[in-house]
C-alpha cells in the first residue's frame, strides 16, 4: 500500500536503536526507549497559505530527521510501523 500524507504531514519510519552500546553492553528490549530518529518516507504537498498556494516543505523523501519522543501518530501498514507527523514536530534534519 502506498501512502501520501496530506497538508504539512510527513510519513516517517523510525530507525531502530542499537542492540549493543559502544562499550559492549547489550541493551534488553525492556530498557530500550523508542528512537527519536527516523527516515522520511513520504511528504505532503505543504501547508496551504492564505493565497491558496502550498508552502514549501523543509524536508524531503530520504531525509534523516530527529523528532520529539511524543511526536506523531503511530500507524501500521503491511506489518511495518510508521509515524505520521506534522512538519513542525520535526526538530532537525541530520546531514551527513
From Swiss-Prot:
InterPro entries of this UniProt entry?
Chaperonin_GroES, Chaperonin_GroES_sf, Chaprnonin_Cpn10_CS, GroES-like_sf
What's its job?
A: Together with the chaperonin GroEL, plays an essential role in assisting protein folding. The GroEL-GroES system forms a nano-cage that allows encapsulation of the non-native substrate proteins and provides a physical environment optimized to promote and accelerate protein folding. GroES binds to the apical surface of the GroEL ring, thereby capping the opening of the GroEL channel.
The alphabetized list of GO BP terms reads:
chaperone cofactor-dependent protein refolding
Which UniProt keyword terms apply here? Answer: Chaperone, Cytoplasm
- Give the family from UniProt: Belongs to the GroES chaperonin family.
Which Pfam families does the entry link to? Cpn10
Would you tell me the protein name for this molecule?
A: Co-chaperonin GroES
Report the GO molecular function annotations. Answer: ATP binding; metal ion binding; protein folding chaperone; protein-folding chaperone binding; unfolded protein binding
Assembly behavior: Heptamer of 7 subunits arranged in a ring. Interacts with the chaperonin GroEL.
PROSITE patterns associated with the record: CHAPERONINS_CPN10
Q: Which SMART domains match?
A: Cpn10
- Record's subcellular location: Cytoplasm
Coarse class of the primary localization is cytoplasm
**GO CC terms of this entry:** cytoplasm
UniProt cross-references to Gene3D superfamilies, sorted A to Z: GroES chaperonin
Classify the source by domain of life: Bacteria
Amino acid at each position: 500500500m502506498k501512502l501520501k500524507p496530506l497538508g504539512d504531514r510527513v510519513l516517517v519510519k523510525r530507525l531502530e536503536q542499537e542492540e549493543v552500546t559502544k562499550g559492549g553492553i547489550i541493551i534488553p528490549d525492556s530498557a530500550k526507549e523508542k528512537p527519536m530518529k527516523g527516515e522520511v518516507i513520504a511528504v505532503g504537498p505543504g501547508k496551504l497559505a492564505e493565497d491558496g498556494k502550498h508552502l514549501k516543505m523543509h524536508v524531503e523523501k530520504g531525509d534523516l530527521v530527529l523528532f520529539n519522543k511524543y511526536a506523531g501518530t503511530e500507524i501500521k501498514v503491511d506489518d511495518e510501523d510508521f509515524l505520521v507527523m506534522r512538519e513542525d514536530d520535526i526538530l532537525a534534519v541530520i546531514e551527513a
